[in-house]
Amino acid sequence: MDLHSYMQDLGRAARAASRELARADTRTKNAALLAMADAIERDAAKLLAANADDVKAAVAAGLAPAMVDRLTLTEKTVAGMAEGLRQIASLPDPVGEMGEFAYRPSGIQLGKMRVPLGVIGIIYEARPNVTADAAGLCLKAGNACILRGGSEAFRSNQAIAACVHEGLAAASLPTAAVQVLETTDRAAVGLLITMPEYVDVIVPRGGKGLIARISAEARVPVIKHLDGNCHTYVDVDADLEKALPVCDNAKTQRYGTCNTMETLLVHEVVAEAFLPAICQVYLDKGVELRGCATTRALIGADKVQPATEEDWLTEYAAPILAIKVIDSLDTAISHINHYGSHHTDVIITENYSSARRFLREVDSSSVMVNASSRFADGFEYGLGAEIGISTDKIHARGPVGLKGLTSEKWIVFGDGQVRG
């Protein structure tokens, strides 16, 4: 069978399975999730063996050490996959929720009901644990899914898929509800993102190049973010003792995450008091600093490299930080909206009016006051789990949890009313 026919068959099976899932009750979906978790624990040795083969091949192919690290499963990460599925089972089921009821002058009562999206295509790279996470989230939200993991994790993903299918079958749900592509042909991605008759939304998780390509070529909606160029602005009215640990955590807790601060903006009035202290923290932790002329004058040209225009635009995902001293809240908002990626941005201030204005005018999916940008996360937001973070303005925005994998439809109750 050729690739086009294979993908069409996959899509048809997913669409049929999605209709069955939409009818499944919470108890059945939870039973499947728990059975998946049990299967993963029981078959842990098989998963680790398959993963060891993937890792061996990746090392032989010269895959970057960071990618090999993401690819590698351990007993702990396998246990974490099982626990993650059990946590998803414990979350409230959004499907079928009704609300916003109101009576109209005609006598009809209308409201909204939350329903599954249908079929979700998820494209990701080296992390095999995403296979279990994505399958669990889509299932709980009543969606079928088609998963295309990185070719370097092919054996691992197939082994995890076998456990997922075992759990679905144990709960008498169609195994086509979760399908992991059984091909490493990259052309399959191009077909997956251009099947609107079978796929309702695409969620890409990976590098900027992958996401940009999918966004440009997809013929179905895409839930995505391209960059995590996050800012923290230390305002003229900031409590500097509060600002220090927040700015430290936002940059140094983890360097490679999309909610890590990449640019620090500091009001000129507090720069002399604040920058030497926070920059020493960064330097002690091995962070490379790139700053404006004022920053370099305050800290020392030998300690701070000159920042370029490109630095204000860059998500480093590394121990590198851009620093700029600015003259006002207006300038901070303007800088963030011009250079930022609409992900997560923070103001440190004790001024209520300034905080309100920052919240209102900064055009990002998460905007924070006096807290680290590292909190922009589905778990920290109480969503329990997330499929990713969206910086788009339509449908889901910010961390996308179970509700973000559903939509709403209008429902109307009447008693024989007709329109006059």
From Swiss-Prot:
Pfam families: Aldedh (PF00171). It comes from the Bacteria. One of its GO terms (molecular function) is NADP binding. Pathway: Amino-acid biosynthesis; L-proline biosynthesis; L-glutamate 5-semialdehyde from L-glutamate: step 2/2. Keywords: Amino-acid biosynthesis, Cytoplasm, NADP, Oxidoreductase, Proline biosynthesis. Its main location: cytoplasm. It is an enzyme of class 1 (oxidoreductase). CDD domains: ALDH_F18-19_ProA-GPR. Catalyzes the NADPH-dependent reduction of L-glutamate 5-phosphate into L-glutamate 5-semialdehyde and phosphate. The product spontaneously undergoes cyclization to form 1-pyrroline-5-carboxylate. Belongs to the gamma-glutamyl phosphate reductase family. This is Gamma-glutamyl phosphate reductase. It comes from Laribacter hongkongensis (strain HLHK9).
